[in-house]
Amino acid sequence: PSRASLHTGLYACNHRSVTNGTPLDSRHTNLALELRKAGIEPLLYGYSDTSVDPRRVHAQDPSLDTFESILPGFKSVVDYNLGYLEGWLNWLEDQGYERPDPSESVFHHSPEKITAGRFCDEPAFYAAEHSDTAYLTHHACHTIRNYHNEDWFIHLSVLRPHPPLIAPAPYNRLYNWRDLPLPERGSSLKNDAAMHPLLELWQEKIDTEDYFGSQANMLRLCDEDILRAKAVYLGLITEVDKNLGTIFDLLKKTGSGMKL
């Protein structure tokens, strides 16, 4: 919903793409289409998570099976989302890593690091300079360096700090979990669920040991592990900040930052 609002300039009550999978009405123009009217080809690095208008495609069109389509108007340069990891995994191979199999295990800790029922905040097997965030940043910077006096537009859409909650060193333990506050909550899961039907439904949904590849039941973590997970989340935010700084520094170095 927020992404659709960003792309269209409309409130969710107007564009009505209010959940992942809710189609975005094709009658709405968007940022990418308007940029094309100005003679600029908008480039996408990452994902736009757009659900196509089913009235504009055949009933058997594969795009109807996903909410991870590209927003009309964008040229996808580097495609990356949880449903498509191949580009990043190929890049990891180029950096000398063994390719994870299956693909989603790139976000898993090795079995010897896992304690049953506990959240694991050990570092990912890849270095910070090879993370999914760094992968998108690297390719976006490569493109920026090739622009000189022409107009350009890049939409860099990184996944993080979205789960899976696993981070490369030092971001996995950049924040001390002991310094963090516990979330505001009821006295028990049962009491929380009784507050609203949505909370009850949500508890049922996440009552699993594979919610976003977490390798632990995120609903039933002890207080310490809740804070460890929170610390990893904050670390992922800081990792994004660091990579944005890399881009801003490049813009200053190339002079592009003066034109934004």
What spans do the regions from the language model cover?
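Formylglycine-dependent sulfatase
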Residues: 1-260
